Each structure stands twice: as C-alpha cells, then as structure tokens.
C-alpha cells in the first residue's frame, strides 16, 4: 500500500474518520482495531497531516521496555567532563509537546510495560516521572491513539501469534474503540478509480 501524505485515497472509511477526528477535536483516546493491512495507522497519519498536527508512531513490540518509554540515565559531556544525566524517553517528551502519539501493535506490548501508559489514558492525567521526582502536565494539544489487530481479548483467529490479552481496566480507559477492516469490493473499486479515472467505479 502506498499513500502520500494528504492523499485522498487513504481516507475511505467514514466511521473511522469520525472516530479519529473526535480524538483530535475533543481530546479523546482512540483505539483503532482491525485486520493487518487495512490502513489503521495510515488513516491516523493522513488525518493528522490534514490538521497539520505532528504525528509520531511507536511500534509497541515485545522488545519495547519501560526504559525505552520513560527514559534512562545517560553519560554526557558537559564542560569537558563526563556527567550522568537523565534522558527522557518518548513518552515524557510527547506528553509535553503538541503531538499525536500513536502506539502501533498495541496488543503486542509486554504486560508489565503496558501499565506505564495507564495514567496518560486519562485526558487530563498528569505523568509522574519518578526518576526526576517530577510531575509532568499534559500539553493541551497532546493526543494519544493506538492500533491493534485484536480487541484486547487475545488472538482467537490464529492469525496474530504473539499478541497479548490486555488488562480490561486499561481497555476501559480508551474513550473510543473503532474497527477498520477490509473494504468491500465496491469501495476498493471506488478507491482505485479515484487515482485511475479511466476505470469504472463499480464492478460489472
């Protein structure tokens, strides 16, 4: 699938579009669930591009650790001397900036890591950075989205080995859960015809 930023052909599902726009407009946490290759992450990116909203995607695979999200102590040079300084991870940085953070493969994250993002699932939830004894307040334009193949109950189809069951207390914190699956034949023809105007818009 090839989509340019701002491409009309990538925004073809009305319900998903409304759900994502609600997330941006009303600061709601939106989880987009669906089969692989349906354009879940791309859909969010395309809408963010139209709104001129910076968008960051993080693949939440099993190798992502708490340190990757929160941050860690790093050795730096300051005035010609080596010092140890805490370097914030992607999560504290995103919270403090007007960006849309997208967690890809949300249901593949390690259970112990998932609880790190529990607090920021609240639209006004502050984030306590214990390593710096600091409470981080969310930027009013910070937005949080996620994509997953399952709805948090594990893989019952056999298609998505490696996905996890998600704590239902955390699932309840998502304000909107929408589904984006494969397009119907008519919709696919309409999408292809949009970029190839000589093709018919419906199958015969």
Language model segments and positions:
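Single conserved hydrophobic/aromatic residue that forms the stacking wall/gate
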Residues: 1-6, 196-204
């Amino acid at each position: 699938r090839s989509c340019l930023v701002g491409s009309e052909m990538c925004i073809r599902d009305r319900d998903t579009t409304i759900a994502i726009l609600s997330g941006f407009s009303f600061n709601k946490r939106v989880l987009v669930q669906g089969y692989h290759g349906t354009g879940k992450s791309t859909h969010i990116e395309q809408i963010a591009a139209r709104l001129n909203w910076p968008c960051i995607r993080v693949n939440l695979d099993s190798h992502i650790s708490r340190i990757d999200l929160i941050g860690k102590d790093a050795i730096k040079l300051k005035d010609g001397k080596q010092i140890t300084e805490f370097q914030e991870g992607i999560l504290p940085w995103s919270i403090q900036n007007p960006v849309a953070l997208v967690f890809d493969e949300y249901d593949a994250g390690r259970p112990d890591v998932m609880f790190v993002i529990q607090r920021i699932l609240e639209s006004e939830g502050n984030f306590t950075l214990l390593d710096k004894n600091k409470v981080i307040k969310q930027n009013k334009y910070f937005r949080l989205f996620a994509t997953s193949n399952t709805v948090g109950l594990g893989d019952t189809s056999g298609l998505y080995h490696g996905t996890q069951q998600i704590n239902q207390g955390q699932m309840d914190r998502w304000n909107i859960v929408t589904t984006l699956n494969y397009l119907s034949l008519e919709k696919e023809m309409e999408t292809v015809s949009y970029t190839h105007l000589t093709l018919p818009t419906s199958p015969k």
